């Protein structure tokens, strides 16, 4: 799965922090969270159009605004690792259009609901209103995909490898539909000061490769995440771990590669075990087979029919395993 992701906007944005978390867990389809802490200079526009584009997004997916969950006092402390200090509603007329939240350590931020969401093949389009120019602003949303897993998967006889190769705003292989956005008054958000990349996977997966930005691997706090994620997804105690990566870049272009592996007892493993067992049985009997008999008949005439059958099975297993190995290449 190509996880290259592009962030575009029709308004110049300073993205102070970008959060992206992939969830490949048991019991549900894969989903991805995005969070943006951004600042806006004075603008005459009434709304901002933000586009998150990636090949894993399709029009059949659901993009859910997580505003109601994120402004909960308990969830704020959990997600931002800081103590909630106070909240002030931002009202336009009788309706709340966001809230200004202060923390003990971090600066005050305005949390905004997403005014409009559209999900298309290859991208999600978000309309944001009522932002603050005095403080930074924050939105968070989740894309529920139709994929079982988002990782690139490679198999061998004893293990399965899950590769998460995520690139943000990579110009190396810019898709044509991104170029069409750039031709239509949109621009890549190149000012992304920090990027946080997280991957939630089943706990039996073992991290086997990571790059410079890797920070930690922890057990998912299932009760807190269960409440935070709308209680729509099954999260069981100690069943999932989450890998945390963090990088800073001047040009807004990021690259993260994290690999997990897990051992498995698959069909090929069982076939290898059967083949080894048959081969060992033949080796144990080879002395008596090669021992000359009184009739002087060749040794292969002394071999029981069952041994010939075992040899044919072993040859068949070798051919099968070689063919499987070539198909994977």
Model-assigned labels for residue ranges:
Residues 1-135:
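N-terminal pre-first-transmembrane soluble regions of secretory-pathway and organelle membrane proteins
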Residues 227-293:
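Cytosolic-side membrane-insertion boundary helix
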Residues 57-66, 203-210, 220:
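Short aromatic-acidic-glycine turn motif
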Residues 122-217:
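Surface-exposed, acidic/Ser/Thr-rich flexible loop segments
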Residues 36-42, 54-56, 143-149, 201-203, ...:
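Beta-strand elements of well-folded, non-transmembrane domains
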Residues 201, 215-230:
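Solvent-exposed, non-transmembrane regions of membrane-associated proteins
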Residues 110-113, 117-149, 247-268:
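Low-complexity, intrinsically disordered segments enriched in Ser/Thr together with acidic residues
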Residues 264-329:
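Hydrophobic, helix-forming membrane-interacting segments
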């Amino acid at each position: 799965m190509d996880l290259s992701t592009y962030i575009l906007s029709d308004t110049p944005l300073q993205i102070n922090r970008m959060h992206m978390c992939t969830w490949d867990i048991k019991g549900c389809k894969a989903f991805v969270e995005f969070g943006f802490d951004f600042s806006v200079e004075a603008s005459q526009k009434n709304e901002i159009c933000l586009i998150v584009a990636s090949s894993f997004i399709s029009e059949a997916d659901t993009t859910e605004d997580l505003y109601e969950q994120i402004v909960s006092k308990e969830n704020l402390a959990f997600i931002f690792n800081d103590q909630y200090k106070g909240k002030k509603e931002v009202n336009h007329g009788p309706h709340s259009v966001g809230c200004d939240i202060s923390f003990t350590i971090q600066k005050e931020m305005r949390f905004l609901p997403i005014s409009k969401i559209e999900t298309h093949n290859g991208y999600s389009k978000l309309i944001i209103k009522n932002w603050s120019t005095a403080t930074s602003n924050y939105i968070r949303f989740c894309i529920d995909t139709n994929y079982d897993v988002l990782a690139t998967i490679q198999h061998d006889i004893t293990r399965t490898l899950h590769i998460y190769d995520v690139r943000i705003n990579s110009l190396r292989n810019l898709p044509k539909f991104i170029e069409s956005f750039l031709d239509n008054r949109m621009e890549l958000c190149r000012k992304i000061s920090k990027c946080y990349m997280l991957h939630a996977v089943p706990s039996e997966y073992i991290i086997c490769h990571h790059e410079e930005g890797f920070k930690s691997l922890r057990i998912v706090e299932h009760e807190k995440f269960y409440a935070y994620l709308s209680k729509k997804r099954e999260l069981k105690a100690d069943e999932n771990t989450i890998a945390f990566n963090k990088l800073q870049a001047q040009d807004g272009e990021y690259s993260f590669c994290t690999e997990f592996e897990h051992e498995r007892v698959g069909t090929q493993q069982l076939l290898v075990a059967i083949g080894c067992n048959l081969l060992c049985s033949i080796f144990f009997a080879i002395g008596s087979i090669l021992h000359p008999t009184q009739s002087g008949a060749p040794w292969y005439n002394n071999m029981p029919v069952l041994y010939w059958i075992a040899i044919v099975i072993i040859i068949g297993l070798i051919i099968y395993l070689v063919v499987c190995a070539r198909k994977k290449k």
